[in-house]
């Protein structure tokens, strides 16, 4: 199976998600992008798209926005796309009803070297605790948060000049660098997962 034969549905919302969205679009058959609905923001109440929706529009990708993740018609829509993997980056927790849809599983990119800083705000915790390094982890999603089998990890140095923005950018790019090898590892070497 070549990479372009691997069907991906991507779930994400933030700027942190975008490098991996591009990597998935460049390397795989990206069937759809699921993101939150556009919202009115600021004083002028302008309608703003999520960063993921903005990029998906620029790339002319199929967008599914603002859905109830447990809605039967949404679930059927995902099944009809015949995904091999879900790739989830900076999105909400997927309900159990979705986890069985992709043929091989759902992969999350988390911005820490799991199990350290499991859960919310891992970048902030690494900075507050003055760590000298952190990293990203790819793992298979299980019903309990950040507990699935780890596929791969990449360590990133934290410099004295790093702040949330700079470290988040480094980690988002590192996650994008891992996604292709992580998917191929799941397909061909699943017995090696941690």
Give the residues covered by each predicted segment.
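N-terminal Rossmann-like dinucleotide-binding module
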Residues: 1-44
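Internal alpha/beta domain cores that form substrate/cofactor-binding pockets in large enzymes
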Residues: 9, 31-34, 62-81, 86, ...
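Donor/substrate-binding cores of folate-linked one-carbon enzymes
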Residues: 26, 85-194
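N-terminal beta-loop-helix "entrance" segment that forms/cooperates
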Residues: 39-59
